[in-house]
Amino acid sequence: MNTKLSLSQTKIFTFTTWFNDTRSGLDRRSSISPTLCSKPVYSGKLKAAKETARIETSNTKNASIEDSFFSKIAINYLSKNLQDAAGISSSSKSTDYDRLVDTATRVSRNFDTKQQHEFVLSSLDRALPTVISSLIKMAFPPSKVSRELFALFTTISFAWLVGPSEVRETEVNGRKEKSVVYIEKCRFLEQSNCVGMCTHICKIPSQIFIKNSLGMPIYMEPDFNDLSCKMMFGREPPEIEDDPAMKQPCFEFCKSNKSYGVKH
C-alpha cells in the first residue's frame, strides 16, 4: 500500500522516535507509538507525553534525595506545626518530606485559599516565636547588607525545604548586589506537582510572613516550565490578583488534583 507522508506527519514521527531514544537511557519505553496523522506537531497528546516524561523524571530524582538527621527534624517540625494549625493529621505512613507534602495537600483539599494562607502563617509563627522575629526585624532593617544576608542565609539553611539554591547578583537602584536566591528545581513544587499548592501553601504566605514578621519585602517568582524559582529580597510583590503566578493553570497531570481533589 502506498502511503504519502505530509510534512507535519513526518515531524510527528520524528519527534516520537527522538522521545523514545531519550527515554531508553532509563531502560524504559514510552507508551507513545508513532502515529501518522495530519495534526500539528505540538498537539495536545505530545504536550501530555512531555509532561508525563517530566513527572517521571522528577519522581526518580526525588527518590534519590537523602535528608540529614537535622533536615528530618526541621521537616517533621514544620509538618507538625501545619497539622496543628489546621487541626488535621497526616495519614501518610512515611515520615519526613512525604508527610509534609501529604499534610500540605490535605490543607489544600479541605480549605479555601484564604484559610490556607492563614494556616501556613500560623505554622510559621509557631516555628519562629514573635520575640525572635521581632529581634531580627529590628537588627536587619531593609538595606543592601540585610538583603544579601537574607539571601545567603536562605541558601545555607533551607535546602531541606526547597532543594539546592545559589545566590545571584542583581541590580537595585543602579547598584549591584547579591540578593537573589535562585532555586534550580524547587523540591516542594517538584514533589507536589501542583501549581495551586506552590502559590497558596508556599509563595503567598511566605511573602507575607517574611515581610510582616521579618521586615523584609520579597517577591518569589516560580517558573512552572522548569520548576525553578527566584526569591528576590527587597522587592515588593505585585497584588495577588495581578501576580502572573496566580494566572497559571495547573499541570494537566497534577497528582494532587487527581488524587485528592485539590481546588485550584
From Swiss-Prot:
It holds the Pfam family D27-like_C. It is found in: Plastid, Chloroplast. One of its GO terms (molecular function) is beta-carotene isomerase activity. The keyword Chloroplast applies. InterPro entries: D27-like (IPR038938), D27-like_C (IPR025114). Residues 1-47 form a transit peptide. One of its GO terms (cellular component) is plastid. Its EC number is 5.2.1.14. Keywords: Chloroplast, Iron, Isomerase, Metal-binding, Plastid, Transit peptide. It catalyses: all-trans-beta-carotene = 9-cis-beta-carotene. Disruption phenotype: Increased shoot branching. Expressed in hypocotyls and shoots. Expressed at low levels in roots. GO terms for biological process: secondary shoot formation; strigolactone biosynthetic process. Its cofactor is Fe cation. Involved in strigolactones biosynthesis by catalyzing the isomerization of the C9-C10 double bond in all-trans-beta-carotene leading to 9-cis-beta-carotene and providing the substrate for CCD7. Strigolactones are hormones that inhibit tillering and shoot branching through the MAX-dependent pathway, contribute to the regulation of shoot architectural response to phosphate-limiting conditions and function as rhizosphere signal that stimulates hyphal branching of arbuscular mycorrhizal fungi and trigger seed germination of root parasitic weeds. This is Beta-carotene isomerase D27, chloroplastic.
